[in-house]
Amino acid sequence: MNPEDAAAIADKCKEADITIQYVDGEQVVLLNGENVNAYLRTEEVGNMASTTSAQPAVRTKLVELQQALAAKSDVIMDGRDIGTVVLPHAQVKIYLTASSMVRAKRRYDELIAKGESCDLEKIRQDIEDRDYRDMHRETSPLKQAEDAVLVDTSDMTIEQVIDRIVALIG
């Protein structure tokens, strides 16, 4: 599917039945009944997500799904417009960031651990391109909510990030 074809994307959004379940303590995302977890963290999906999420039909569908999920139970959500569009009245908002090189290295290490071949510089460039697209899209642009706490994780370990978030929620 062409990521620029707004009409085709809008039609697919109407057909999409996305649900989240928990199986053996793990979150499972189902698209029309199929577990799609294995696809969600691929480079292809990440890059396509940035392009297609600029389409108003996609943003509308995703916001509806995320708000419905949050209405059912307490949630921790991450996403580029969660604190500004999806859940603007959330009790706690944290804007996690890191330099593009640190994010690229983390992604590179993740892909290498999965046995995938990848190029660190290409990943960095893809991240910067995606950030630019997301910050400049017309619908739900990426920006820090005014009441969000900024946490720059560039020089933090995962344990330090967790400790910081727990302290904020505390």
What do these predicted ranges mean?
Residues 16, 25, 36, 41, ...:
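Glycine-rich, flexible loop/turn motifs
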Residues 4-8, 44, 53, 57, ...:
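Charged, alpha-helix-enriched surfaces in structured cytosolic catalytic cores
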Residues 21-23, 66-72, 85, 89, ...:
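Small-molecule kinase domains that catalyze NTP-dependent phosphoryl transfer to phosphate-bearing small molecules
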Residues 12, 126, 168:
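Short acidic/histidine-centered micro-motifs embedded in hydrophobic/aromatic stretches
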Residues 33, 62, 76, 127, ...:
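Residue-level signature of catalytic and energy-coupling elements of molecular machines
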Residues 164-170:
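C-terminal alpha-helix
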Residues 1-42:
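N-terminal phosphate/diphosphate-binding loop that engages ATP/GTP or pyrophosphate donors
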Residues 37-46, 53, 57-114:
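ATP-dependent NMP and nucleoside kinases share a basic, alpha-helical "lid"
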